[in-house]
């Protein structure tokens, strides 16, 4: 329905911008028919868009090689991290090997104790004994050195910040070492900025597949829930299934996933229009820039956040991967303290934010195609949104209703039928 709505107002071979790109799914669906621009305030989305949406020549795609990524720089960083964290790495491997396929009992309980008491940045206290030999690296003083110079060798951000619950330590060592490798390749001139974004996008993909969290995002790290020794508890079968999933993810090899994504990308990448471009800006700054108007884009696709959820919390880890800045963190989820919250997510600001957005679209002579899911969590009712649309686009507003299922995280029922609206605002001179 979204593609059809965009097709209905956009001329053949015209151009479309997805102003809140997110996962870039919509932009990808348009790439064969239009010049596509995409924008997102989050840096991880921007990097993914640079890999998926921007044009790359056959020469660039053919020049991508795993030998570079897993070459000298990768080996150098991995060797140093493996030396520094040798004791917890060895203990973790033994725990995962000893568990086998038995997800309860004394052996699993030992792993749970390790999982629940892993040291992390600025919190070395009350850690499992396997961290004793390397505990100084987790001290606030050591972390501060990295905050002052994030390029310090060895790259250690994930190893220090996210080793349990989110990832296993061996996965963190891999993530840090791959990131070090592609940064050094860029710094030494062995790869271009364009290639660096593509290589980094594969690492974002890996994080999504191995993270230990509730739901399909990074907002809530998953805990290992208890089971009774005789498995007679009401939720024991569910908790066992979750334990199995956690162990399966912990055992996954990042390098293998990275290689698979690399091969898939090289085999399936289809170049779109050479003018395709990704932006990483607040939409107000982008739409107010005279250079934007000069692009003569026909249509804006708009799917901003409509609830009071902190969306930046959902993707704080890929954001930190891209920024690689050893951030200040807080709470059990180790969220960035500087995380961004859109005005669309704040009840007192949402309507005015929408009004600003539609005004800027109109000033740029853009058709606007808006997705809106009418769920219980939405801040703005559909009536308010359509009213603002009519304020700027008058009678040239079409509202369509499309039902779909959505995930209702942490609530019952878990899957809920929502009203999905597609609002088309047609610009007329």
Regions found by a protein language model. Name each.
Residues 376, 382-429:
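Class I S-adenosyl-L-methionine
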Residues 4, 136-300, 307-314:
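SAM-dependent nucleic-acid methyltransferase catalytic core
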Residues 51-155, 161-164:
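Conserved phosphoryl-transfer catalytic core
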Residues 306-352:
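Mobile active-site "lid"/loop adjacent to the S-adenosyl-L-methionine
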Residues 345-363, 384:
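A short, acidic, amphipathic alpha-helical segment used as a generic capping/interface helix at domain edges
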Residues 1-15, 19-20, 25-33, 48, ...:
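S-adenosyl-L-methionine
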Residues 328, 366-372:
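Conserved beta-strand signature within the Rossmann-like core of class I S-adenosyl-L-methionine
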Residues 16-29, 38-43, 204, 292-314, ...:
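Conserved proline-anchored active-site loop of SAM-dependent methyltransferases
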């Amino acid at each position: 329905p979204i593609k059809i709505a965009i097709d209905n107002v956009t001329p053949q071979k015209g151009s479309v911008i997805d102003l809140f790109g997110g996962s870039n799914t919509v932009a990808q669906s348009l790439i064969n028919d239009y010049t596509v621009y995409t924008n997102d305030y989050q840096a991880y989305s921007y990097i993914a868009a640079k890999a998926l949406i921007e044009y790359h020549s056959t020469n660039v795609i053919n020049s991508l090689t795993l030998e570079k990524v897993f070459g000298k720089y990768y080996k150098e960083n991995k060797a140093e991290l493996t030396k520094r964290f040798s004791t917890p790495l060895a203990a973790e491997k033994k725990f995962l090997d000893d568990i086998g396929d038995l997800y309860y009992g004394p052996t699993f309980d030992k792993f749970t104790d390790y999982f629940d008491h892993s040291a992390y940045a600025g919190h070395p206290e009350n850690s499992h004994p396997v961290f004793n030999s390397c505990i100084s690296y987790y001290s606030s003083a050591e972390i501060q050195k990295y905050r002052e110079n994030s390029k310090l060798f060895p790259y250690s951000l994930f190893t220090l910040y996210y080793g349990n619950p989110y990832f296993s330590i061996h996965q963190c060592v891999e993530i840090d070492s791959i990131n070090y490798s592609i940064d050094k390749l860029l710094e030494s001139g062995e790869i271009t900025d364009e290639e660096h974004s593509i290589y980094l996008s594969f690492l974002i993909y890996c994080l999504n597949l191995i993270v230990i969290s509730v739901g399909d995002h990074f907002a809530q790290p998953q805990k290992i829930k208890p089971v009774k020794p005789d498995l007679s508890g009401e939720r024991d079968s569910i908790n066992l299934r979750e334990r199995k999933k956690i162990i399966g993810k912990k055992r996954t090899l990042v390098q293998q996933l990275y290689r698979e994504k690399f091969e898939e990308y090289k085999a399936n990448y289809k170049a779109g229009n050479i003018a395709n471009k990704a932006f990483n800006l607040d939409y107000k700054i982008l739409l107010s820039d005279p250079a934007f108007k000069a692009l003569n884009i026909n249509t804006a696709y708009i799917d901003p956040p409509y609830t009071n959820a902190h969306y930046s919390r959902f993707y704080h880890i890929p954001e930190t991967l891209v920024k690689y800045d050893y951030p200040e963190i807080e709470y059990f989820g180790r969220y960035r303290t500087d995380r961004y919250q859109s005005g669309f997510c704040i009840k007192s600001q949402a309507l005015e934010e929408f009004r600003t957005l539609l005004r800027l679209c109109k000033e740029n002579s853009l058709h606007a195609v808006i997705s809106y899911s009418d769920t219980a969590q939405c801040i703005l009712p559909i009536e308010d949104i359509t009213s603002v649309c009519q304020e700027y686009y008058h009678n040239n507003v079409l509202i369509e209703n499309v039902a779909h299922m959505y995930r209702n995280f942490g609530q019952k029922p878990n899957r809920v039928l929502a009203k999905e609206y597609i609002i088309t605002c047609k610009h007329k001179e």
